[in-house]
Amino acid sequence: MTTAQAAESQNPYLEGFLAPVSTEVTATDLPVTGRIPEHLDGRYLRNGPNPVAEVDPATYHWFTGDAMVHGVALRDGKARWYRNRWVRTPAVCAALGEPISARPHPRTGIIEGGPNTNVLTHAGRTLALVEAGVVNYELTDELDTVGPCDFDGTLHGGYTAHPQRDPHTGELHAVSYSFARGHRVQYSVIGTDGHARRTVDIEVAGSPMMHSFSLTDNYVVIYDLPVTFDPMQVVPASVPRWLQRPARLVIQSVLGRVRIPDPIAALGNRMQGHSDRLPYAWNPSYPARVGVMPREGGNEDVRWFDIEPCYVYHPLNAYSECRNGAEVLVLDVVRYSRMFDRDRRGPGGDSRPSLDRWTINLATGAVTAECRDDRAQEFPRINETLVGGPHRFAYTVGIEGGFLVGAGAALSTPLYKQDCVTGSSTVASLDPDLLIGEMVFVPNPSARAEDDGILMGYGWHRGRDEGQLLLLDAQTLESIATVHLPQRVPMGFHGNWAPTT
């Protein structure tokens, strides 16, 4: 068991539902209410930020915390174990007083920061993922750190937190960004052998934060939106005060004109005075647009479509269909009107996220936008055997009574089942003291309907201060089973079901 010192907080992203835990725990034979389906054989894993050392509440950004992965293993109708582990980056090893087992090569990505955003399995590996050019890590099945991952040297400069798995081929598609790439993002395909088989550099208007993208059967969809790299947030922690203004001017003059070599981009890893600020901010002068590229195309094949200024972390799904003889692209997204404008510590203070649908007529170039549900919601998931094709159902987590900025009695996190065909929705009947995070869809064996499956995700019962793994019927939203955990799991970001192979 490893324990870090807990820090006092005056930051809503360090409190309540979002507060970090200070102890690594291993527990076996977990108590269960209800019955775990016998066919579930694997691990539910979720990643999220969990600072290992004291941070400055005034500047700490939710997205910059050290990575901690939480997992529950299910087999034979039982919850075999729960584990939570920090990913052993050099900074985490130093904070815990442990030797650094493997230091990333500069080509692998930016060492500063941690892979705190997603966790999934691919080609026999468990991968802790992050974006912005930061190094990703491989974990063991028991969530201990193996070391940095660059797909056996086939992909340099970092990856993404949001790859999309092609349900037909099993390959991982991704769009990756980093300030070190200049005015470019990179589309990549990781084969089922775990190696990058294709990369394409795509020119964009600046240096945007591009958290995710959409994949259809025929296209890659890129969201080039007005949250961009802000050198003002980087310089103060890394250079003397008298050099700050010249350094900012240098960064602003270089950024986007050249691609920064990997060793130079990695220099910040050795600078003293780590900052917990996020170096991205709302940029009202930056054009908002959507790029559409054929899967086998290149930069010259990208078509750009202007949209109203906004920000999207999470597209729900995308597909194309024929309407009146024209090909139309349908994009379902969770949309914010702005991001990191007034509140620079997290996504909660600028606007409420709504579920929107954008359609692009690829023949005429016309773009239409429709708000499908204006209730605040996030973390959209579907039956991912349908990625890239038409879908009907989606599952989102609502945020009511204060968007991600506290865990008082006013905060609730309803679970919505969205019918994207009729526009209607159903709300799960959850205990009002239960706060939940992202819910993952796991299809049932021999499923005969799109929604024939299980929803799986972590919750916190604030009345009992208890962490839980919830299993819900995806058709009815009724409880199937609850696994009672030995500690609270912070809300975190993204997770996935990793079946035993």
Curated annotation (Swiss-Prot):
E.C. numbers: 1.13.11.-
Cofactor: Fe(2+)
Keywords assigned by UniProt, alphabetized: Dioxygenase, Iron, Metal-binding, Oxidoreductase
Molecular function, one GO term: carotenoid dioxygenase activity
Residues holding Fe cation: 162, 211, 314, 494
GO annotation (BP), single: carotenoid catabolic process
Other known facts: M.tuberculosis is assumed to be unable to synthesize conventional colored carotenoids, but the data obtained in PubMed:20929460 reveal that M.tuberculosis may utilize carotenoids from host cells and interfere with their retinoid metabolism. The occurrence of suitable carotenoid-substrates (i.e. beta-carotene, lutein, zeaxanthin and lycopene) have been shown in human plasma and tissues, and the apocarotenoid substrate beta-apo-10'-carotenal may also be present in lungs.
Family statement: Belongs to the carotenoid oxygenase family.
Function: Catalyzes the oxidative cleavage of several carotenoids and apocarotenoids in vitro. In contrast to other carotenoid oxygenases, cleaves substrates at two different sites, namely the central C15-C15' and an excentric double bond at the C13-C14 position, leading to retinal (C20), beta-apo-14'-carotenal (C22) and beta-apo-13-carotenone (C18) from beta-carotene (C40), as well as the corresponding hydroxylated products from zeaxanthin and lutein.
Entry protein name: Carotenoid cleavage oxygenase
Organism: Mycobacterium tuberculosis (strain ATCC 25618 / H37Rv)
